[in-house]
Swiss-Prot record:
Keywords: Cell membrane, Membrane, NAD, Quinone, Translocase, Transport. It holds the Pfam family Complex1_49kDa. This is NADH-quinone oxidoreductase subunit D. It catalyses: a quinone + NADH + 5 H(+)(in) = a quinol + NAD(+) + 4 H(+)(out). It comes from Deinococcus geothermalis (strain DSM 11300 / CIP 105573 / AG-3a). GO terms for molecular function: NAD binding; NADH:ubiquinone reductase (non-electrogenic) activity; quinone binding.
């Protein structure tokens, strides 16, 4: 009796395979919000990824058209709830350009500080949750330790830890507390030591390096064609940062570097955000040195609310206050767009004015919506486990996606 060794079937006629579709979300820890991904897989390998958005649609763009320009400040920070000051600043800059408003130097400096603190806050959430998605629990607590300290600074200035609504057309809602600059300086001292810890736990972790290096590569030309911005674009070798390319709030007077990588993979996107934490701290330290006493609002009473002290002595101030609160100001007819650099990329508010007290049209250029379009390109051909890494490295915020 002879025996033949058993061999697995290799002929296409004998081996039958089929594509399996898998739902990821809309409630899934890795999406950090309500995002549904339909993933087509051939075995363990991804053949297609289709994002289904809209679960967090708020209708903010349309809401802006039914609110005065002053009331719009309330809605802007809720679009990206991790870098609230990014959208808030982009909105008021567009309205100020439409009006030709003059923002005092002190208000501009405070805006820069809060803008960069907001970037730090967003990147800290990215660092903590990005590693958590890959199974590393410890960095989450380290990053959220500093995140809570940043939110304490926000609360000290404007009373809110999130969705602050602190900026105003023409300046700020109120001045910062006297001890706030000292608190910021003390935070930066501990924060920069914390970044060293993140690099030890995060950038030098061999397991993480194996999961992220060479995974989800987005080449330079593809990143440009897809319209990516922010760290996702700079990780692919394009040194575009609107703080340098289209300066606003005096960023051209600050000394800082724009981190760039040529790798284009998930590891590069993680590493760039770590480097940006240090650059933001550098900018804030410079802003602290140039913070001088002065006004915090445009003196034009047809734009800015008069201080409470004037309301007790001036009938003209009472009239201006009444008109601004009940009706708002009337910008000239025209359209405007000011690009800014948020934690996720280019944020801009395209505003059309018909001369009324409310915008005729507001279009929000949000980076997360555009950046998410790169997900399929980065995932196809890789394993399903890599999808979680790639999605975390793109760092979308769903409020920024759906609007």
């Amino acid at each position: 009796m002879t025996t033949e060794p058993l061999t697995p079937p290799t002929s296409g006629a004998l081996l039958h395979t089929e594509i399996m579709s898998l739902n990821v979300g809309p409630q899934h820890p890795s999406t950090h919000g309500v995002l549904r991904l339909v993933v087509d897989m051939d075995g363990e390998y991804v053949t297609r990824v289709t994002p289904h958005m809209g679960y967090l649609h708020t209708g903010f763009e349309k809401t802006f058209e039914h609110r005065t320009y002053h009331q719009g400040v309330t809605y802007a920070p809720r679009t990206d709830y991790l870098h609230c000051f990014g959208h808030e600043l982009a909105y008021v800059l567009s309205v100020e350009k439409l009006l030709g408003a003059e923002v005092p130097e002190r208000a501009t400096t405070v805006r820069v500080m809060l803008h960069e603190l907001g970037r730090i806050h967003s990147h800290l959430v990215f660092v903590g949750t990005g590693l958590l998605d890959l199974g590393a629990l410890t960095p989450f607590f380290y990053a959220f330790r500093e995140k809570e300290a940043v939110q304490d600074l926000f609360e000290a200035v404007c009373g809110y830890r999130m969705n602050q609504g602190y900026f105003r057309v023409g300046g700020l809602a109120r001045d910062i507390p006297e001890d706030w600059p000292a608190r910021v300086a003390a935070f930066l001292d501990t924060f920069e030591r914390g970044v060293d810890e993140y690099e030890t736990l995060f950038a030098k972790n061999p397991i993480f390096l194996d999961r992220a290096k060479g995974v989800g590569v987005i080449p330079r030309d593809v990143a440009i064609d897809l319209g990516l911005t922010g760290p996702n674009l700079r990780a692919s070798g394009v040194p575009l940062d609107h703080r340098k390319a289209n300066p606003y709030c005096g960023y051209e007077t600050y000394d800082f570097e724009v981190p760039v990588s040529q790798a284009g993979d998930s590891l590069a996107r993680f590493q760039l955000r770590l480097l940006e934490l240090r650059e933001s701290a550098k900018i804030i330290r410079q802003a602290l040195k140039r913070l001088t006493p002065g006004p915090i609002k445009d003196p034009n009473r047809k734009i800015s609310l008069p201080p409470r002290s004037e309301l007790e002595t001036s009938m003209e101030a009472v009239i201006h206050h009444f008109k601004l609160v009940t009706e708002g100001f009337h910008p000239p007819k025209g359209e405007v767009y000011v690009p800014t650099e948020s934690a996720r990329g280019e944020v801009g508010y395209y505003i059309v004015s018909d001369g009324g007290s409310m915008p005729y049209r507001v279009k929000i250029r949000a980076p997360s919506f555009v950046n998410l379009q790169a997900l399929e390109y980065a995932c196809v051909g890789g394993q399903f486990a890599d999808l979680i890494t790639i999605l975390a490295s793109i760092d979308p915020v769903l409020g920024d996606v759906d609007r």
